[in-house]
Swiss-Prot record:
Assembly and oligomerization: Homodimer.
Name of the gene encoding the protein in the UniProt record: aroD
Organism, scientific name: Shouchella clausii (strain KSM-K16)
Principal EC category: lyase
Catalysed reaction equations from the record: 3-dehydroquinate = 3-dehydroshikimate + H2O
Protein purpose: Involved in the third step of the chorismate pathway, which leads to the biosynthesis of aromatic amino acids. Catalyzes the cis-dehydration of 3-dehydroquinate (DHQ) and introduces the first double bond of the aromatic ring to yield 3-dehydroshikimate.
Gene Ontology molecular functions: 3-dehydroquinate dehydratase activity
UniProt EC number: 4.2.1.10
Active site: 144, 171
Sequence similarity: Belongs to the type-I 3-dehydroquinase family.
Known pathway: Metabolic intermediate biosynthesis; chorismate biosynthesis; chorismate from D-erythrose 4-phosphate and phosphoenolpyruvate: step 3/7
Protein name, per record: 3-dehydroquinate dehydratase
Residues the entry annotates as binding 3-dehydroquinate: 46-48, 82, 213, 232, 236
Length: 256
């Protein structure tokens, strides 16, 4: 399989991929969830493993990852552990154990894309980058701010930092307080998509940020998140509604 997430140039509106999260806490819940979500035919499936209550049992996680792959209907799987500091669920395993878990799922070919936080220690980032390259796993370096929206320059700098660290994709998610914040995020997205050599994924969260999830592709964001069952972040729309909005944008903005 080629790289699931491809670059857009930011100068021409393009339809973003749709990624749907999987947030089940048990193996049975995840299998039920992926069967329902895959039927909606998103472009990617994101397993938020920090929601999984057995994250501390490596063999259990690997077995579940294998089952998810078998039930994915060929849809690429994005593997994500989101830390508490960036909006994730509390877990009982160390950062070193998380890194080892990422290594295992990549080496066993159980996932297609991994999300690693920019704040991850340099040595661990370097280690995961090498394994991602070795296993041809696409890797995202991400930054999430659930408190505010940084300046346009700071958002752009985070995406540039992702590229400088060898990421295949850069991702930034922020929390807006005003519509001006949403526009700041979208302007930074357009600049990043126009100047970086890697794909970028951006979104503003919450109700205000929904606009960025619908129209982010017009500014160069390569992917947006939508829910089929349960949300993994504030502001995510149902996949059917989002797809309808993207169809309208395609028809009247991109001319597709």
């Amino acid at each position: 399989m080629g790289k699931p997430i491809q670059k857009t140039d930011g100068s021409t509106p393009q339809r973003p991929l749709i990624c749907a999260p999987l947030v089940g806490k048990t193996k049975a819940a995840l299998i039920e969830e992926i069967d329902a979500v895959a039927a909606k035919k998103p472009d990617l499936l994101e397993w938020r493993v920090d929601f999984y209550k057995h994250i501390g049992k490596t063999e259990d996680v690997l077995e579940t990852a294998s089952l998810l792959k078998a039930h994915s209907k060929g849809i690429p799987i994005l593997f994500t552990r989101r830390s508490i500091r960036e909006g994730g669920e509390p877990i009982t395993v160390s950062e070193q154990e998380v890194t080892a878990l990422y290594e295992q799922v990549m080496k066993l070919g159980l996932v297609d894309v991994v999300d690693v936080e920019l704040s991850c220690p340099e040595a661990e980032k370097e280690r995961l980058r090498a394994i991602a390259k070795e296993t041809e796993t696409q890797w995202i370096l991400s930054y999430h701010d659930f408190q505010r929206t940084p300046s346009e320059a700071d958002i752009l700098a985070k995406l540039q930092e992702a590229e400088a660290n060898g990421a295949d994709v850069g991702k930034v998610a922020v929390m807006p307080e005003t519509m001006a914040d949403v526009l700041t995020l979208m302007q930074a997205t357009q600049k990043a998509a126009s100047t970086l050599t890697i794909p970028v994924i951006t979104m503003a969260m919450g109700r205000l940020g929904t606009l960025s999830r619908m129209a982010g592709g017009a500014c160069g964001s390569a992917l947006t998140f939508a829910i089929a069952n349960e949300s993994s972040a504030p502001g995510q729309m149902p996949i059917d509604e989002l797809r309808s909005v993207l169809d309208v944008i395609d028809r009247y903005v991109t001319g597709q």
